């Protein structure tokens, strides 16, 4: 009697990129090597490494990292035996020269991230990276801001440029499972590239969103050990591995080495537990980009305005990544008038 083939999912780990945001980009190359080695031993096939915002982001605006991106990449490359090392490239922050340095340091995969309405901005780096022989994964950031069909139209552009994988990216942690499933299903109807899903956990449903995305056609799922990541953090790699296995999926990774790496290497490096606090929750509820988390907390303290009110107003204005300067504008405006917590547009 034949049995159906087990469903397969590929877990990509971003502890050493998105997780950098939780430690103020202060992982050392030795930390990177130790974590990458543990992930590699667990069978994780792709490990993303860079400043938390991506290549070239170490700056006064986004925070200075403890080392350079090439130093981080080399540390990871030297530590692994089987895994590919990837880096995040955001047009407008990184340059192709910085991507070339990452290639020289040993990356095999690049992840090109564009705002969900701006797939055109990915054409040059995607095509250039393919010419260099890289595997190219692409991110449609803030995917909650587009309905499924328009999002699929943007995905089709990235597919046409040669992307190997197109990700639905919940940058704000604003999605619930139906949102994740509907968007992935829409992409599956129009693109031939593989589909990925990148969750943030602001509404506490990062794992559920990832499972639903997979059931609707995603074959690449991002996670980070201990959930390390911007604001409320990402779907937790070791929990993803356990949940997918329980749901009947073949992840190709070994759960116990993942847990050991999370527990004994990552946890001692954490500045604080990765939790859904008030600011993280409202950030997801308001649909604001995850990098606004710490600057909003600082502005709230400086201006004596509740962080949630700042975030609700930013959500009403529809801000996106790169508009962090709006935080100060909104905080100062709210501090100068009598206000009530603003409602979301359309609510």
From Swiss-Prot:
Substrate binds at residues 17-18, 171, 198, 289. Residues 9-259 form the Pyruvate carboxyltransferase domain. The keyword Cytoplasm does not apply. Keywords: Aromatic hydrocarbons catabolism, Lyase, Manganese, Metal-binding. It holds the Pfam family DmpG_comm. CDD domains: DRE_TIM_HOA. GO terms for biological process: catabolic process; L-leucine biosynthetic process. InterPro entries: 2-IPM_HCS-like (IPR050073), 4OH_2_O-val_aldolase (IPR017629), Aldolase_TIM (IPR013785), DmpG_comm (IPR012425), DRE_TIM_HOA (IPR035685), PYR_CT (IPR000891). This is 4-hydroxy-2-oxovalerate aldolase 4. Its EC number is 4.1.3.39. Signal peptide: none annotated. Mn(2+) binds at residues 18, 198, 200. Belongs to the 4-hydroxy-2-oxovalerate aldolase family. It catalyses: (S)-4-hydroxy-2-oxopentanoate = acetaldehyde + pyruvate. The record marks 17 as: Transition state stabilizer. GO terms for molecular function: 2-isopropylmalate synthase activity; 4-hydroxy-2-oxovalerate aldolase activity; manganese ion binding. NCBIfam families: 4OH_2_O_val_ald, PRK08195.1.
